[in-house]
Amino acid sequence: MKESNLYFIYVGNAYPHKNLKRLIEAMVSLNKKVKENIELYLVSSRNVFTKRLEKLIMKLEAEDYIKLLGFVPDEKLKFLYKRSLAFVFPSISEGFGLPGLEAMNSQTLVACSDIPVFKEIYKDVPIYFNPFDVNSISDSMKLILDIDPEAREKRIEKGLELAKTYSWSKMARETLEVYRSAI
């Protein structure tokens, strides 16, 4: 795989609630609006859902710039996060949202759905969009392309600080304290 200089990344499974169909449609829309060749890397294990996405990508004639990467080892994934324009998380429902924190911890800008769980966890760090509106998703990606470098860095720094508040060791200590207080 040859990495593009300009790409967005999604990491996670391809279940329907992840809303990757609209993300793909938004990417097609974005590429019609900009002069640069912008790519989208979808990092997701292969299954029946990724097969459906492959068919959609081919139908939309987007296979030149939307890539289904399958499984990617952690070291390669860190590299892909770091070099990406942003991690895009278009889910219509989530229980928590760990992938966004992983992206922030990798010093990657995040654009995500404006669903309540993301707003609660991610605060004002990401660029939010309406996950039911392809134009809203596409517009948020365009905003990322046009963002001032200083504003971009501030968001990335803020994301890294937020991600640090969700460390596994901190969560374990807090859980242990809850158990101790219950005894």
Language-model regions, residue ranges each:
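Carbohydrate transferase catalytic cores enriched for Leloir-type hexosyltransferases
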Residues: M1-I183
